[in-house]
């Protein structure tokens, strides 16, 4: 597992998220996302240091 540096879409603050190696981050948004039908795409919640909840979508 690797640590990715991501930016909060609400305020631009940088936050870290542990993700499996060799994934591609597709989006970081404040809008709640449901799990896609594609087994190779996942959505995980996270929050920045300012408390903004965001959703990270990534593909294996």
Curated annotation (Swiss-Prot):
Zinc finger (C4-type): 8-52
Keyword Ribosomal protein: no
Entry-linked InterPro entries: Brz_Regulator
Pfam families in the cross-refs: Zn_ribbon_Brz
Keyword Zinc-finger attributed: yes
Molecular-function GO term, any one: zinc ion binding
Assigned keywords, A-Z: Activator, Metal-binding, Transcription, Transcription regulation, Zinc, Zinc-finger
Function, as annotated: Activates transcription of bacteriorhodopsin (bop) and phytoene synthase (crtB1). May interact with DNA or RNA via the zinc finger motif.
Recorded family membership: Belongs to the Brz family.
Protein name in the entry: Transcriptional regulator Brz
UniProt source species: Halorhabdus utahensis (strain DSM 12940 / JCM 11049 / AX-2)
Encoding gene, per UniProt annotation: brz
